[in-house]
Amino acid sequence: MLCASAYTAGDYAKFGLFHNRCYKWGYFPETIRYPSIDDLIDRKAKATILWCGRFLDWKHPDDVIEVAKRLHEAGCCFKIEMIGTGEMERQLKQQASEAGLLDENVRFLGAMSPEAVRRHMESAGIYLFTSDRQEGWGAVLNEAMNSGCAVVASYAAGATPYLVNDGVNGSVYHSGNIQELYEKVRRLLENTTMQYSFGKAAYLTITELWNAEVAAKRFLQLSQALLNGTDASGLFANGPCSLAKPLREDWYQR
């Protein structure tokens, strides 16, 4: 079983299926290798926070507006860019407007091409990934990390446990805990050195491990081992095609 979500192995284990036969997988959008990741991060707008996706309840874009309110009340200098459209758009704009944040601190940029989204990721210092357990993977996380963003990611989304090592290449928070999300965003706004460190480590995570090239090579090695009847559980220590063990729903402890 190739698990394109960190929760897949655990879901199947509940039915007694694929014991020790689950391997980590994922979605692999285009990987961009920049001439200098240091130069890219240096050019980023450190006070710019980006969110991208459909405006749906299980993606929790409203949590971003709530964080914006708290940042504003705390006197933080910031700008949030929201890319996307969806059923919550009117509600979100109303929330931002009522808080006096619309256009000043929170901008809604509408839908745009994947290429344009990547340009915004390359410019933003921080990226918020707020989806809950209904997000099977979330390829925007790969893209934001590839773009050198310091990510703050919900622990509940399927990609987060595989891609984000909390405190090393990004931050993880408990889905729905707005105060925790706010605290981690504010810490990054106030500590640009941490932004740089997380962003560079995130970039290396994607370019050196979690990408299509590595996944394809490892898939061939894994397939050959399985066809030969070889124990493949220790073939790779981590990353694509490494053994995927059942993950507890409450795996993330702050």
What are these regions (language model features)?
Residues 72, 180, 187, 194-209, ...:
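A short, well-ordered alpha-helix in the C-terminal region of glycosyltransferases
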Residues 1-48:
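Donor nucleotide-sugar binding/catalytic pocket of nucleotide-sugar-dependent glycosyltransferases
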Residues 111-112, 119-124:
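Short alpha-helical donor nucleotide-sugar binding micro-motif in glycosyltransferases
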Residues 150-154:
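Short hydrophobic beta-strand element within catalytic cores of glycosyltransferases
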Residues 122-136, 149:
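Acidic donor-binding loop of glycosyltransferase active sites
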Residues 38-70, 81:
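Conserved donor-binding/catalytic core segment of Leloir-type glycosyltransferases
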Residues 93-112:
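Nucleotide-activated donor-binding/catalytic signature segment of Leloir-type glycosyltransferases, i.e.
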Residues 166-167, 171-178, 187-192:
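Conserved acidic donor-binding segment of nucleotide-sugar-dependent glycosyltransferases
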